Amino acid sequence: MAEDKPVVESFQLDHTKVKAPYVRYIDTETGLHGDVISNYDLRLVQPNENAIPTGGLHTIEHTIAVLLRERIPGYIDCSPFGCRTGFHLLTWGEHSTEDVARALKESLEFIAYEATWDDVPATTIESCGNYRDHSLFTAKEWCKDILAKGISSDPFERRLV
């Protein structure tokens, strides 16, 4: 008898149908003790059409780790996709895609228009596993481009926040 293979949700998504930038609710899981964890797709650029260079993505990652934590109750983690088109956001509890999209927009606005190198946390050899691979300039330019397109609370229809 063949074993059922695990299903990876993001591999089931038709990446040709989505319209980035967007926030997409992926799933909520309930742990053994009733704890609820939600997973969101924060897609910043259109899949298979573009990818954020690693230095810029790395800097966005470090900076939104602080900015989203301040804006989303129950923030757990925000990790980049290997394809470099966005991030997975994990939170305790559930949040609307509109609320997450607003928090993301505010965070990207800060990076694009206000952030200085002092606002990028953990950029030393002691605090980062690849401290040489950061670019605030690249992060700012990509954030401006993403914001110009607008952040949607829906992956398939443009519902800008």
Swiss-Prot record:
Keywords attached to this entry: Autoinducer synthesis, Iron, Lyase, Metal-binding, Quorum sensing
GO biological process annotation, one example: quorum sensing
Note on how the cofactor is bound: Binds 1 Fe cation per subunit.
Annotated Gene3D superfamilies: S-ribosylhomocysteinase (LuxS)
Protein name listed in UniProt: S-ribosylhomocysteine lyase
Gene symbol of the encoding locus: luxS
Organism per entry: Bifidobacterium adolescentis (strain ATCC 15703 / DSM 20083 / NCTC 11814 / E194a)
Catalytic function, reaction form: S-(5-deoxy-D-ribos-5-yl)-L-homocysteine = (S)-4,5-dihydroxypentane-2,3-dione + L-homocysteine
SUPFAM superfamilies with a match to the protein in the record: LuxS/MPP-like metallohydrolase
